[in-house]
Amino acid sequence: MAKRKVTWTKAAITQFDKIIDYIRQDSDQNADKIKDKILNKINHLSDDRIVHRKDPYKKNNDGNYLYFEILKYRIVYYKSANEVFIIRIKHTSMEPKRY
């Protein structure tokens, strides 16, 4: 079975960079650990066997908008037939917004 390509939206890249930069203000080591763990989990989304929950904050979600949480961060992604799009990354303490 072919693996899906993982693509980040510009918004998700910006959010992720801000998160890592914020953590780096206190600890380079913690920033690197968190960055590596999140990236590792995201890279595994290309595997078809990975199943996460449907994103309840997506309006009219046909089931292709999914999410998972890791290290108090909520990652939302869209899963198409050939590709996974990373949509957003937010800390779980932030109020989720419908989109």
Task: Describe the predicted segments one by one.
Residues N61-N64, K72:
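Short acidic/glycine-enriched loop/turn segments that link adjacent beta-strands
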